[in-house]
């Protein structure tokens, strides 16, 4: 079993900061790294720069106890968690420059035995690409793509699966998918997350872990889009969509979601494009223009000319602010 005393979290947004604070609350020494000087200063004062229930209390306690400290420059640690944005460039192409920058930033402080984890939602192959960038910057160390199980540095992907507004609870309670580039990488990553995760830590390979997160969010995207289109159709046909869905869901194998203002959040509306980019020739259904307009560009009932704001919108998830 791998022992960890210190963790560096690269990117202190809506995933990185809660993750850093949660590790710190379990007694690890945590170094949070971010290029945003304001975020760094705010955290070091025991405050938070994003809105997330309970996060302020966890951060304040961790900083007060000396377990969490923020900086703009990476420092040595036993494990590194990369939680930076993965936006799109023109043409719906994933932009991995933040991952590349993070890799080059941590490379100088890596030492034999360290673990590097990519948490950012990424196209398939991004973890391997991150490992390649690290290897290029540190030719004196061996990495999984060349040395396999015997590599000096272990590399894995562990996608976040939390709901904004419930991040602190779900970080601890949700199952985690652990995808290492080798079995040794997976085991080391599982040992790290077991420090605070009460859910199951399920081991697989890096590519499967990457695809798992994309599949989860794409599945939700499709189902939300279906519910929203039903709402528009029912409005045309003078049918109560809520009653319709309630009755249809009495079928034991049907579970239609409720219509709403469309797909939101940081991931669900864009993750299908990661799948398309990873296998454009094979992702014919998801990449088909008409289908893409429906599920990927899903604007929900707001695109409907007769969209109406109803009290049911109050049932939406609480509003939260922040970047990954």
Predicted segments, located by residue:
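Structural/interface elements that position substrates and couple domains in central-metabolism enzymes
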Residues: 1-324
């Amino acid at each position: 079993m791998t022992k960890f005393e210190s963790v560096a979290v690269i990117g202190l947004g809506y995933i990185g900061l809660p993750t850093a604070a949660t590790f710190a609350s379990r007694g690890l020494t945590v170094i949070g790294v971010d290029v945003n000087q304001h975020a760094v200063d705010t955290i070091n004062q025991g405050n938070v720069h994003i809105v997330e229930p309970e996060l302020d209390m966890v951060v304040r306690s961790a900083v007060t106890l000396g377990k969490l400290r923020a900086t703009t420059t990476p420092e040595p640690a036993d494990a590194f968690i990369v939680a930076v944005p993965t936006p799109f460039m023109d043409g719906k192409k994933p932009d991995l420059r933040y991952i590349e920058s993070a890799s080059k930033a941590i490379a100088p402080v890596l030492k034999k035995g360290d673990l590097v984890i990519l948490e950012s939602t990424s196209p398939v192959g991004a973890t391997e690409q991150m490992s390649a960038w690290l290897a290029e910057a540190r030719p004196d160390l061996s990495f999984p793509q060349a040395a396999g199980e015997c590599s000096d540095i272990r590399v894995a992907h562990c996608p976040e699966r939390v709901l904004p507004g419930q991040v602190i609870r779900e970080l601890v309670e949700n199952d985690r998918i652990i995808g290492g580039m080798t079995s040794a990488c997976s085991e080391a990553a599982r040992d790290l997350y077991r420090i605070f995760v009460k859910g199951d830590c399920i081991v697989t390979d890096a590519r499967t872990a990457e695809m798992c997160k994309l599949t989860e969010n794409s599945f939700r995207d499709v189902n939300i889009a279906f519910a929203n289109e039903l709402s528009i159709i029912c409005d045309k046909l003078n049918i109560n969509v809520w009653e319709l869905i309630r009755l249809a869901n009495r079928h034991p194998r049907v579970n239609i979601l409720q219509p709403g203002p469309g797909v939101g959040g940081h991931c669900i509306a864009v993750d299908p494009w990661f799948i398309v980019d990873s296998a454009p020739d094979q992702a014919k259904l998801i990449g088909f223009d008409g289908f893409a307009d429906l599920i990927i560009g899903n604007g929900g009932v707001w695109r409907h000319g007769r969209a109406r704001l109803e009290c049911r919108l109050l049932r939406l998830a609480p509003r939260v602010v922040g970047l990954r």
